[in-house]
A protein has these predicted regions:
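Structural cue for short, hydrophobic secondary-structure segments
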Residues: 54-57, 84, 265
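Short beta-strand/loop motif that positions the catalytic acidic residue
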Residues: 208-210, 214
């Protein structure tokens, strides 16, 4: 009887997963694809005003992450579109985005260029007015890259268990950055970013997430990332620290008293994206999807005003 029950549960889980993935359509003909990435998307029948880009972590399937994190359910609930760039095994044996490779992180080259072309193509196809980006781990590092290379494309972003860009220029410095934080100072990161975008005045809103026990990507990366982005955004006021049971949120406000940058530190959790299965579209526990008082997807969508 127990074996039969487990088989039924497994069957239902697989069926639900395939059902969720069936919501996505392949994105074809999005222009040049120098990074040789795949892409799929979800959109409601009605025209979507917003497009959210999700960049998965290593060894993950982007569509499954969208479903398990609660982001797909939120897209259906709030009526925004989802774009899922997908790494291919032939590009990286662990299916990580190559965020540390000069061939892929440089503006208008490799994977960075491919993702930009996906965004602009789908944005035109769907008629979306605004674009947002969220990434987990290696996808978080790539999201950092996209926000720096193409800040004009995005209203806002979220980097979860990731690192700031530019932090690494090869695999060795990439590993060092993951374990020890950036070798650059906050001021140097700001200067490098401004030099890449000399005409950019306004920067995307940013939400940065880490678990305080993350032993894969040092939490120091998130702290530095938030401080660097606040300085990049010309924020002069002191940050506000909000301590809650199980997490701490530090917020930096711009001159209009709007939160421009936030750092969410979840106490005693490791490497992953936070989910709260107890709330609607709060996500479900799995590998690198960690039960928490907060749902990252739910919180970020609210933070962005979607």
């Amino acid at each position: 009887m127990q074996i039969l029950t487990r088989l039924i549960v497994s069957f239902l889980t697989i069926s639900l997963s395939f059902s969720a993935l069936a919501n996505f359509k392949e994105l074809q003909h999005f222009g040049q694809n120098p990074g040789d990435l795949g892409a799929s998307y979800f959109a409601t029948q009605a025209q979507s005003k917003a497009l959210v880009v999700l960049l998965h972590g290593c060894a993950q399937h982007g569509e499954q992450l969208a479903q398990q994190s609660g982001l797909l359910g939120l897209a259906k609930e709030h009526g925004f579109a989802l774009l899922i760039p997908q790494q291919r095994l032939m590009n990286n044996i662990k299916r990580c985005f190559n965020w540390y490779s000069d061939d892929d992180y440089t503006k208008d080259k490799g994977e960075s260029s491919s993702i930009k072309n996906m965004i602009t193509t789908l944005q035109k196809q769907l008629g979306t007015e605004s674009v947002y980006i969220i990434g987990l781990s290696g996808g978080g590092a790539m999201a950092s890259n996209m926000l720096v290379n193409y800040p004009y494309l995005f209203e806002a972003g979220a980097v979860v268990a990731g690192i700031p860009f530019p932090c690494a220029d090869d695999l060795i410095t990439g590993i060092s950055c993951m374990k020890n934080g950036p070798s650059q100072t906050i001021e140097e990161l700001v200067s490098l970013t401004r030099n890449l975008n000399p005409k950019q005045k306004n920067w995307p809103q940013l939400s940065v997430w880490t678990g305080t026990k993350d032993n894969i990507v040092a939490p120091l990366n998130s702290s530095i990332h938030a401080q660097y982005w606040a300085q990049l955004s010309h924020i002069k006021t002191k940050a506000n620290v909000d301590k809650q049971e199980g997490y701490v949120i530090t917020r930096w406000q711009n001159a209009a008293k709007e939160v421009q940058v936030e750092l969410v530190e979840v106490i005693e959790l490791g490497h992953g994206i936070m989910v709260n299965p107890n709330i609607k579209n709060g996500g479900e526990e799995s590998d690198y999807l960690l039960a928490s008082p907060l749902s990252t997807a739910q919180h970020v969508i609210n933070f962005w005003g979607l």
